[in-house]
Curated annotation (Swiss-Prot):
Induction description: Up-regulated following injection with the Gram-negative bacterium E.coli. Up-regulation increases between 1 and 12 hours after the injection, then decreases between 12 and 48 hours, and then increases again at 72 hours.
Keyword Signal annotated: yes
Signal peptide annotation: 1-23
Organism name: Drosophila melanogaster (Fruit fly)
Localization in the cell: Secreted
Sites where a glycan is attached: 79
Matching InterPro entries: Interferon-induced_GILT
Cited function: Involved in the immune response to bacterial infection.
GO molecular function, one term: oxidoreductase activity, acting on a sulfur group of donors
Family stated for the protein in its record: Belongs to the GILT family.
Protein name, per record: GILT-like protein 3
Record GO cellular component, one term: extracellular region
Pfam family, one: GILT
UniProt keyword list: Glycoprotein, Secreted, Signal
Length: 216
């Protein structure tokens, strides 16, 4: 009897225990979506503000999306021979490197939905103002500021650069579903993000999301 009880107890634990590493229960089916972008890139700003944000909000897709943001884009690292330190260069100059690093610190120190909403607000203009956006949203960004002030830009951007440079991207923003990078379909994904999201979700989970019937 004790053995039977033990087996039943173990089975129950396996059924209800969260998936390791993500805190989600097994029935929470989320599609992994990675956005590789730049803080001063007009196309990045347009995609995030006009397509990605609206898609997640209007379709109520936050609960089915595992969103990853990589503020690096077509940047790179080099060794400063005079100091011996690793440094970073960015497509739109030094200011973009600093803003990319600030975005990275926001992503590191806030939960992803709060971080995304804050970045969405900042991308209204090229100044990427953190103060007005954080105050209007009532978000504490002290840890993000500390992150930015306590480390070099290259150190902050290193993990984001590592993932982005693996892809060898030629355009920003670049969107990747489930770590499966398709360089030839990027324009279509950018212009028809909702349709591609629906297709990818159906492909992975064999589930057509409620709003996808009108999209596919």
């Amino acid at each position: 009897m004790n053995k039977i009880f033990g087996l039943l107890f173990t089975l129950c634990l396996l059924l209800v225990w969260p998936t390791p590493g993500n805190g989600q229960s097994p029935d929470e089916s989320r599609l992994l979506v990675a956005i590789h972008y730049e803080a001063l890139c007009p196309d990045s700003m347009s995609f995030i503000r006009r397509r990605l944000y609206d898609a997640l909000q209007d379709n109520d897709w936050w609960s089915v999306t595992d969103l990853k943001l990589y503020p690096f884009g077509k940047a790179g690292f080099y060794n400063n021979t005079s100091t011996g330190e690793s440094q970073v260069f960015c497509q739109h100059g030094v200011d973009e490197c600093e803003l990319n690093a600030l975005h990275a610190c926001i992503i590191e120190t806030l939960d992803i939905r709060k971080a995304f909403n804050l970045i969405y607000c900042m991308l209204r203009s090229y100044s990427n103002e953190l103060g007005p956006c954080s105050r209007s949203m009532g978000v504490d960004v002290s840890k993000a500021r500390e992150c930015k002030a306590s480390r070099t830009t290259a150190e902050i951007l290193a993990p984001y650069g590592k993932e982005t440079l693996k892809l060898g991207i030629s355009f920003v923003p670049t969107i990747v579903f489930e770590n499966d990078f398709d360089p030839y379909d990027q324009r279509s994904i950018r212009n028809n993000f909702e349709r591609h999201f629906c297709r990818q979700y159906l492909k992975k989970f064999n589930i057509k999301l409620p709003t996808c019937s009108a999209i596919l």
